[in-house]
């Protein structure tokens, strides 16, 4: 009888434990800001736009600000290295004072090897430099193989991740994500999947997709958007994207700016005309 009672008590305790609610999963919010801004040859004009973006990010209490491809130097192979270096000191100092981390798109000539790179440079909130992602899928027009393109002017480096506090993130630049078959001499290495395999939870994509006013927009924009959404879903990734915009506000860019969630849906998306800033809190479990 005693053993039967002990068994019954144990069963009741086990049943009670099963009814207890599971502990809630801990979430961590990463507040991001993005800048859809004009990118020109004028480094000083670019700096003005970038400083406005930093001010916006600080007002939104963002952890990090993403800018478009070439947003400091201009998106040109013959960028002015001296002015870019001086501008880099100015914008990183502004971000440090504001307490905002940076994912800054710029072309840059690295002092360790003297080579030019199309970069996404990462800085922590205290201004410390975390390193850079170099564009991997450098472009050349496939239909005209004798033409010169990015691949003839810029070098690249191995894919890597970065740590923003306790969050592992990755950076990609424009064609790195969608490997446009008209502009990509290399095979598609599926860089989003590689970054997911390296533990990245969030990818920051700096874009300078080009401005068009033709039927091409009906083809290229859906291609870019579907790649963003499918690759986010495939890698269970958050993807934050910031594209350059027409300084005159007439032409549309070829890629939406905003935030795509791990289900492949837009969490936030901005209009493709004019300068736009945006902010969003990514909840990471």
Segments predicted by a language model, with ranges:
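Short beta-strand segments enriched in small/hydrophobic residues
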Residues: 26-40
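Active-site-proximal beta-strand/loop segments in catalytic clefts of secreted hydrolases
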Residues: 35-38, 67-70, 105-108, 133-136, ...
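CN hydrolase (nitrilase-like) catalytic-core segments centered on the catalytic cysteine
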Residues: 83-104, 178-277
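Active-site catalytic loop in hydrolytic enzyme cores
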Residues: 112-202, 206, 217, 223, ...
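Cys-nucleophile CN-hydrolase/nitrilase-fold catalytic domain and related Cys-dependent amidase chemistry
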Residues: 43, 48, 52-126, 140-141, ...
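Hydrophobic helical h-region of N-terminal Sec-dependent signal peptides
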Residues: 8-14
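Bacterial N-terminal signal peptides that target proteins for export
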Residues: 1-8
């Amino acid at each position: 009888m005693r053993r039967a009672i002990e068994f019954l008590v144990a069963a009741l305790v086990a049943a009670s434990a099963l009814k207890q609610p599971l502990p809630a999963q801990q979430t961590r919010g990463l507040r991001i800001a993005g800048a859809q801004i004009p990118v020109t040859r004028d480094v000083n004009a670019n700096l003005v736009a970038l400083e406005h973006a930093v001010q916006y990010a600080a007002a939104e209490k963002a952890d990090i600000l993403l800018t478009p491809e070439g947003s400091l130097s201009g998106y040109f192979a013959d960028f002015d290295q001296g002015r870019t270096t001086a501008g880099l000191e100015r914008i990183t100092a502004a971000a440090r004072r504001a307490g905002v981390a940076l994912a800054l798109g710029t072309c840059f000539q690295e002092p360790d090897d003297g080579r030019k790179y199309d970069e996404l440079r990462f800085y922590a909130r205290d201004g410390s430099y975390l390193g850079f992602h170099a564009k991997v899928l450098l472009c050349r027009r496939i239909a005209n193989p004798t033409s010169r393109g990015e691949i003839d002017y810029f070098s690249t480096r191995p894919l890597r991740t970065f740590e923003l506090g306790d969050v592992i993130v990755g950076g990609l630049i424009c064609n790195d994500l969608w490997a446009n078959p008209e502009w990509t001499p290399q095979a598609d290495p599926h860089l989003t999947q590689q970054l997911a395999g390296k533990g990245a939870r969030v990818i920051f994509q700096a874009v300078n997709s080009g401005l068009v006013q033709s039927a091409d927009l009906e083809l290229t924009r859906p291609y870019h958007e579907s790649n963003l959404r499918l690759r986010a879903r495939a890698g269970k990734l958050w993807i934050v994207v910031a594209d350059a915009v027409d300084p005159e506000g007439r032409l549309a860019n070829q890629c939406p700016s905003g935030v795509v969630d791990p289900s492949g849906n837009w969490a936030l998306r901005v209009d493709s005309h004019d300068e736009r800033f945006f902010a969003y809190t990514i909840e990471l479990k």
